[in-house]
Amino acid sequence: MAFDLTIKFAGEGGEGVISAGDFTMRAATYLGLEVVTFKSFPAEIKGGYALSQVRMSDEKILSQGDGFQILFAFNGEAYEVNKPLLKPGTVLVWDGPEGGDFEPEFDWLEKQGVIAYAVPMSKLAKEEVGASITKNMVALGAASELFNIPIDVYKEQIVSKFSKKGQDVVDLNFKALDAGINWVKNNIKKADPYRLPERMPRKDVIILEGNEAIALGAAVAGCKVYAAYPITPATTVGNYLSELILKANGYVYQAEDEISSMAIVIGASFSGVKAMTATSGPGISLMQELIGLASMAEIPAVIVDVQRGGPSTGMPTKHDQADLYAAAIGGHGDGQRIVIAPTNVEENFYLTVEAFNLAEKYQCPVLFLTDASLSLRVEAIPTPNIKEIQSKLINRPLITKDMNVDLNEILRYKVTETGIAPMLAPGVSPKPYAATGLEHGEDSSPRTRPDIRVKMMEKRFRKLQNIEDENQHLIEWDLGDLQEGDKADISVIAWGLTASITKEAVQRLRKKGYKVAALYPKLLYPVPAKAIEKVASMSDITLVPEANYTGQFARFVRMYTSVRPVQLNVYRGEPFIPAEIEAKIEELVGSKVNA
């Protein structure tokens, strides 16, 4: 039986629950386990409910799971919020019997079959360690002793994180770890079955956070200019990228606002280099006119949108998938843009590389839709082969001065069969051109004649008319044991982080005997209509789960295909759990008996 364990730390923002989860995640990866994290915290600097959840397994993990086996409740709110999730066999480690702000209902816990351990985290931190701020380290010491988590890995991380603050700070945290360990040794008799396994052979992996993976992908793709205005939850893309891009003679600029950052990206790309910005929903709203300029002037640009709860300021630190309309059709006029979305941290890396390839190939803006949960999610992914990736990079066709080309034949916006024409760059190319938001002719001069307008509009749209056929690698099929022509019980289409969660639900359903045909498009716009029609034709029911109120991709499916999908939506600021999608499919199809 596979090892699969989820530990959740929950409490008040500022108590160190996020750090506790991060430390535990790294301990699990040290043991050779697969990991997936889920973090959530309020917009306030201190206070409000925060959580960090670490799922670990010796097999591939697709989602954060349905719940947890172990809960560390740092305060009463953490207990109350998670009380409905305390199932038979789960473990509650609570801040008591003294020093905490709550006491659980022991009779209820016993009836539920919940195992409760009292560890006075607050009291030990304050009285024995002498620093209330070390409460989370007391919890980690208790976790180490209770669940066989390697204490040496915790200590290594303390040294790595706090050594710059001095040996006294390191020793203080060590003391807190020891306080938690000793309390468990002297006061708790273990009554649960949960223990981390012994160390397995180390896999060739790297540990990446979602936004960190985007930054690494941009650097590998050859991004030379990054401009952005800080905004939650996208800011760390620039923080990570600044360390990478400067080493490659690149340029990082914090603009005065999102409009300026998009203008800088366009200017940099016009000059001949790859450029990117990252923002969230409010920033996308501000960038719309300039995204239209990149479309009209046919300038490659990569725009990362780390979606958060909206509209307006909304919920800056919470999960959502509600920027699809803004990304795909948010601008005025008929412009060309490509929208893609990763499903996990590994794809955050590879799809960022792909975003640059698409921008360079089709000479248009590419919007990359990730989200708050995926930005913070941590996974151990197979180490990428950087040389192989870079050997396959796509770079814009550029006319340079050393080419033997007749100047009179150089037309930046030449009408071609594909709609794509060679680009020019100042100082590199033998002839200048005007990159303008005005409608223009092949030579880039402003034109408003009806015949030229028709010709140029059709030229620009011709670039993307075959994008689905040319990018089948951006459309992931999962038919299980079904063959082409077989009848499925249901078809499922999911995108973004919801796709990863859907995959786990589909796996469970297949074990129960359900025949599920699944499609997980990374290319969202232009809508991959052929693939959608095909997967929907395999059954009488098509389900589209997504984390927004209106069912934005489901409505795109209705708009661009003959398919009329069933919608399943969450909009609570947290992702689906697999059980929700599993239950909806069972409801739609009816009960099955596993043959």
Question: Where do the language-model regions lie?
Answer:
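Active-site cofactor/cluster-binding pocket
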Residues: 1-221, 225
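Short, solvent-exposed amphipathic alpha-helical segments in soluble enzyme
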Residues: 23-26, 87-89, 107-111, 133, ...
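Conserved thiamine diphosphate
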Residues: 118-119, 141, 318-365, 391-404, ...
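Thiamine diphosphate
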Residues: 3-83, 232-329, 338-359
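A short helix->loop->beta-strand "cap" motif at the edges of active sites that frequently abuts
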Residues: 86-92, 97, 112-114, 250, ...
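Short gly/pro/ser/thr-enriched loop/turn and capping motifs at secondary-structure boundaries
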Residues: 42-45, 99-102, 124, 235, ...
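Flexible, low-complexity linker and terminal segments
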Residues: 207-215, 219, 351, 356, ...
